[in-house]
A protein has these predicted regions:
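N-terminal intrinsically disordered, acidic low-complexity segments at the extreme N-terminus
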Residues: 1-15
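Catalytic-center loop of serine/cysteine hydrolases
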Residues: 46-48, 84-202
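Boundary/linker segments of alpha-helical solenoid repeat arrays
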Residues: 234-235, 269-279, 309-316, 338-353, ...
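Structural motif corresponding to the intra-repeat A-B loop/turn of tetratricopeptide repeats
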Residues: 210-213, 247, 291, 324, ...
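A structural "domain/chain start" motif
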Residues: 23-24, 29-82, 197, 208, ...
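Residue-level recognition of tetratricopeptide repeat
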Residues: 205, 242, 249, 286, ...
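Alpha-helical segment of the N-proximal tetratricopeptide repeat
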Residues: 196-225, 229
């Protein structure tokens, strides 16, 4: 009896079946490896790109390390340091190729791209069996950590001007930055000739930096006292006029007060010794802006910027751009101002100086930057 035998499987078909699965698993494994390598490289690269900062040797940060001595406290101590820091920053930004960021009012500890750091601190040190308070100023090159300048000053009632002059001269040598003749002439015009008067002026200037109503009122009072006691100090007279016209922009003066202020401004802007100073054009810019004369204000503040690169000039430039409906340019101006002097003071000026500004609307980048703090 014949029985049916099943047909034998073709060797060629079996080989093709085996080859298919070999290649399938090989390609699958290869794809998984490629995906894992891609994910791992992406995961390691992203954090590195956020943390890497290249130093700029021409940028300088000014920081306040310690605001007072433990054994001695003076209402003028901090104002003097703030005034010196503001003067150094404005002088270098105006008369050199360095870009200085005055961070005395900025308390956020974050990485910086500045190649150099100028630190101001008040420290106690035992001197002749007694505790004495020193103002310590140190300039460090962040590229190699070396100290370029290390000075300590004992502040007395009459040596404030001498300390400031010595510091400027020492910075000139440390940075290999000769001061031009125009800077020397400017300092002669904007600073009093007596050290004790400088402390009072810096206290009034500190109130101006704050920018709020109470501070501006106090600044006006102090500057009025300085002008009354030292009428030859015409720069204090100009700064009082600036403070008063800003106060008027926020809370209008009565008719009699405004007439007196306008007369004072007319007299100040004609003083020959102040003609080449930025503050004259700040006064003109604010005065014109209050009256709605944006083109006149724009011309004035740009002349002021040519004479002095300062945070206040760029705040005022931003205000002029806003009034002209040029919000993109206003945002650039406000960011420049905050970059020159970051902190709550400059932010207050941006938001409330002359008129109120919506930072989220006009400068959304700055709003997000501050929110991330």
């Amino acid at each position: 009896q014949n029985t049916a035998t099943p047909p034998e499987q073709s060797p060629v078909k079996s080989k093709r079946f085996t080859t298919f699965w070999v290649w399938f698993f090989f390609l699958l494994s290869l794809g998984i490896c490629v995906a894992l390598v891609a994910f791992s490289s992406l995961d390691t690269r992203l954090p590195m790109s956020k943390s890497r900062i290249l130093l700029n040797p021409r940028d300088i940060d000014i920081n306040m390390v310690n605001k007072s001595c433990n054994s001695w406290s003076s209402p003028y101590q901090l104002s003097y340091a703030i005034g010196v820091g503001d003067l150094v920053a404005t002088s270098l930004n105006t008369f050199s190729t360095f870009m200085v960021h005055d961070k005395i009012n900025y308390n956020i500890d974050e990485p910086s791209s500045s190649g150099k750091t100028l630190s101001i601190a008040f420290v106690n040190q035992r001197q002749y069996r007694a505790q004495q308070c020193f103002m310590s100023i140190k300039l460090v090159d962040n590229a190699d950590g070396s100290t370029m300048l290390d000075k300590r000053y004992v502040i007395t009632n009459g040596n404030q001007l001498a300390i400031q002059n010595d510091l400027l001269e020492s910075l000139s040598k440390a940075l290999n930055q000769p001061w031009p003749q125009r800077m020397q002439e400017t300092l002669q015009q904007i600073l009093p000739h007596r050290g004790a008067l400088l402390t009072n002026f810096y206290q009034a200037h500190d109130y101006l930096l704050h920018g709020d109503d109470k501070s501006l009122n106090r600044a006006s009072e102090l500057l009025g006292e300085i002008v009354q006691s030292s009428p030859e100090f015409t720069y204090a007279r100009a700064e009082k006029a600036l403070v008063d016209i800003v106060r008027h922009s926020q809370h209008p003066l009565d008719e009699k007060q405004l007439a007196a202020l306008n007369t004072e401004i007319d007299n100040i802007v004609t003083l020959p010794e102040l003609n080449n100073l930025s503050i004259i054009y700040q006064i003109k810019a604010v005065s014109a802006l209050v009256k709605g004369k944006t083109d006149e204000s724009y011309q004035a503040i740009n002349t002021g910027i040519d004479l002095e690169m300062s945070w206040l000039n760029y705040v005022l430039l931003g205000k002029v751009y806003e009034m002209k409906g040029m919000n993109r340019e206003a945002a650039d101006a406000y960011l420049t101002a905050f970059n020159l002097r970051p902190g709550a003071n400059t932010l207050y000026w941006i938001e409330n100086g002359i008129f109120q500004t919506s930072v989220p609307y006009v400068v959304p980048y700055l709003d997000k930057f501050l929110a991330s703090e």
